[in-house]
């Protein structure tokens, strides 16, 4: 049987990257819609999350593509090595991934403090309501990730752990993937309801997009 039918190949080198890229796409499109509607400011943190998740996912996907092709992936003829170089720079220009992590964590840390820990708990409650209506889109698992993030931030507050820069960077990463899990669940719900925007990407049908969202939510919650 071809490699494309072997889980050791697809589930390591293809599926995780396709899923994370779709999460980034969902967050980008959701943020773009919010900007178009106006009234929420520049959404700088959301922009940082969109760039961070999408560029890191693209870089990981390109690296996996080289691995998937074996020796051929490393040669000029197959162009994959060029794709890797091209996508690698996206994690550097217009703000490195580390700057994005710091930008994200600082803003969301302030939101956590201002809301007395309610910022992500409130979002989790909304996702749980969505899960009651459309359990297939993975919103319940995304809600679990949001509650876990809220608890983690509270532990960091009590222990004053954010005095350590490494902790802030790690929080930025966790915030980004957690918020993207919610965006993808909402996108899958809109697809199931048949109300995606006219210009939205439709490479996945509603059932497939729901499956993608569930996989992403479970990976995030872990």
Question: Can you say where each PLM-predicted feature lies in the sequence?
Answer:
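Alpha-helical interface subdomain recognition
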Residues: 1-222
């Amino acid at each position: 049987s071809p490699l494309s039918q072997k889980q050791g190949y697809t589930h390591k080198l293809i599926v995780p990257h396709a899923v994370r890229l779709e999460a980034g796409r969902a967050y980008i499109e959701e943020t773009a819609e919010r900007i178009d509607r106006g009234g929420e400011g520049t959404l700088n943190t959301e922009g940082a999350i969109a760039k961070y998740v999408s560029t890191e996912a693209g870089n990981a996907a390109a690296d996996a593509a080289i691995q998937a092709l074996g020796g051929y992936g490393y040669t000029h003829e197959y162009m994959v090595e060029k794709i890797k170089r091209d996508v690698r720079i996206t994690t550097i220009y217009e703000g490195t991934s580390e700057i994005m992590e710091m930008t994200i964590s600082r803003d969301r840390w302030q939101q956590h403090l201002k809301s007395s820990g309610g910022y992500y708990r409130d979002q989790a409650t909304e996702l749980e309501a969505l899960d009651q209506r459309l359990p297939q889109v993975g919103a319940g698992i995304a809600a679990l990730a949001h509650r876990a993030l809220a608890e983690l931030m509270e532990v960091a507050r009590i222990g004053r752990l954010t005095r350590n820069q490494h902790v802030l960077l790690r929080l930025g990463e966790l915030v980004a993937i957690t918020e993207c899990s919610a965006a993808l669940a909402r996108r899958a719900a809109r697809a199931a309801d048949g109300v995606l925007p006219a210009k939205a990407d439709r490479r996945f049908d509603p059932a497939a997009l729901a499956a993608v969202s569930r996989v992403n939510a479970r990976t995030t919650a872990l």
